[in-house]
């Protein structure tokens, strides 16, 4: 399914369509098209059928229990590391990097199970498991985009630290089950800036880690926060982090809503190109669609 075709001659302006035959593909290749954006979620299988429902994501109880145990242990370790950062204590950055690599391994080996396990979080571990999930998805997406291993590792660390500002929010606001007041909402919205200021005191952190902490709630049209930056001022790593962060939030269990399916979340984000980088949304969909079911 073609979402858009970049053509100097504008043959396909504002058109979205499904390619069903080789002849149709050849017709596109004969135009001035220089780039085609594909939506794998709306396409057909090679035999012309719409994709069938994927096999059940349920795996053996043993596999799920093992992944749950690994993520729980990682969440406890991350809680300690983030607590040290908030308290101003020195933190071994090599340890953080290794933790991000270990977490990436879980997500690479057991993507579907990790998605299942991290959707349901206890109140006490929400921020930490969310951060691990975002970190894992960011590394998967970075590798899919063929970023080098050093950059991928840094993005893994950035995912783990992106919500550290939430630890500076009073717990009665952060975990409030009901509707937030306007003032409470302002406190919540301050967490990217608060986290950024905290991480500034750690000069060993790469600049992109601070950028992602500060800017992961920005939107391409400038309607995000805290700075209201627009597309031209938002780097690829920041756009990547935004897509992973929102996807994880939408597909997680919350007291006030059911978790969205992966397809629902991806479709919702894809329909909002003024907020999210569509190429990142499509690529994340591909990563999840190609994930091993074990």
Segments (PLM) and residue ranges:
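Non-catalytic interface/linker regions that flank or bridge core catalytic/transmembrane domains
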Residues: 1-121, 125-126
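Histidine- and acidic-residue-rich, metal-dependent catalytic cores
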Residues: 74-294
């Amino acid at each position: 399914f073609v979402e858009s075709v970049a053509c100097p001659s504008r043959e396909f302006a504002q058109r979205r369509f499904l390619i069903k035959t080789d002849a149709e593909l050849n017709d596109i290749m004969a135009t001035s098209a220089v780039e085609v954006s594909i939506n794998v979620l709306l396409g057909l299988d090679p035999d012309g059928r719409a994709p069938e429902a994927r096999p059940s994501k349920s795996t053996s109880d043993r596999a799920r229990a093992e992944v749950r145990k690994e993520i729980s242990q990682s969440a406890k370790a991350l809680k300690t590391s983030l607590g040290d950062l908030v308290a101003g204590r020195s933190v071994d950055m090599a340890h953080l990097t290794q933790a991000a690599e270990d977490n990436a391994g879980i997500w690479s080996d057991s993507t579907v199970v990790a998605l299942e396990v991290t959707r349901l979080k206890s109140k006490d571990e929400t921020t930490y498991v969310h951060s691990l999930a975002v970190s894992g998805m960011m590394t998967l997406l970075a590798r899919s985009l063929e970023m080098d291993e050093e950059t991928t590792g840094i993005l893994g660390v950035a995912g783990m630290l992106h919500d550290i500002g939430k630890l500076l929010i009073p717990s009665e606001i952060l975990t409030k089950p009901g509707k937030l007041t306007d003032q409470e909402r302002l406190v919540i919205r301050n967490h990217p800036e608060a986290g950024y200021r905290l991480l500034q005191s750690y000069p060993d952190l790469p600049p992109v880690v601070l950028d992602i902490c500060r800017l992961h709630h920005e939107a391409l049209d400038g309607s995000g926060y805290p700075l209201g930056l627009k597309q031209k001022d938002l780097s690829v790593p920041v756009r990547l982090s935004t897509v992973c962060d929102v996807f994880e939030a939408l597909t997680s269990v919350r007291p006030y809503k059911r978790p969205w399916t992966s397809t629902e979340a991806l479709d919702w984000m894809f329909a909002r190109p003024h907020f999210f980088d569509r190429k990142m949304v499509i690529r994340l969909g591909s990563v999840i669609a190609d994930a091993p079911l074990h």
